[in-house]
Regions:
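RNase H-like nuclease fold core
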Residues: 1-49, 60-64
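Charged, low-complexity, intrinsically disordered terminal regions
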Residues: 2-4, 121, 127-128, 145-147
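Intrinsic disorder/low-complexity signal
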Residues: 7, 50, 123, 143-144
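RNase H catalytic domain
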Residues: 10-16, 21, 56-127, 131-136
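Low-complexity, intrinsically disordered short peptide segments enriched in small/polar/basic residues
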Residues: 25, 80, 143-144
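Active-site beta-loop-alpha junctions of metal-dependent nucleic acid enzymes
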Residues: 44-51, 90-94
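Flexible, low-complexity interdomain linkers flanking nucleic-acid-processing modules
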Residues: 136-147
């Protein structure tokens, strides 16, 4: 059985800190057939935090569904290289997320692969659609909507 988990995070942050409204999404395939998809808002987060949250969500779904030995695909070099032990994590906001992934790794095996952005198009679209929906809710439609 082949389990593939496609993950992506998105943040609408601007400026130097790049923290803004964020969302994560994941799609899961078993033997090339989609069996699950998930997206959720995260509040104010960086893009790297959102990318980690997408991986964690995918892993948790796999662990609950007995989907063993998944291959996790992410377009984030930071996330892939930190999880695979190639890069050290020096960011205080990412370290707890990396530790969560390591705790999950104690439960079952998985492989993390960095891919081109086009490879994770589906969760990318889900995460951005989620953020678009949030923005539409916050945008006043008439002058009476402005407080």
């Amino acid at each position: 059985m082949i389990i593939e988990v496609f993950c992506d995070g998105a943040s609408r942050g601007q400026g130097q800190k790049r923290i803004g409204e964020a969302a994560c999404a994941t799609t899961i395939y078993r033997n090339r057939k989609k069996i699950a998809q998930f997206a959720r808002g995260l509040g104010p987060r960086s893009n790297n935090e959102a990318e980690y949250e997408a991986v964690i969500a995918g892993l948790l779904i796999c662990s609950m569904g007995d989907l063993l030995n998944p291959v996790i695909y992410t377009d984030s070099a930071v996330v892939a290289n930190q999880i695979n032990g190639k890069w050290k994590c020096r960011n205080d906001s990412l370290l707890p997320l990396l530790m969560t992934v390591e705790d999950i790794r104690d439960e079952f095996n998985f492989k993390v692969v960095q891919v081109e952005r086009s490879f994770v198009w589906e969760p990318d679209a889900l995460a951005n659609e989620f953020l678009d929906t949030l923005e539409k809710r916050k945008t006043p439609k008439t002058k009476d909507d402005v407080v």
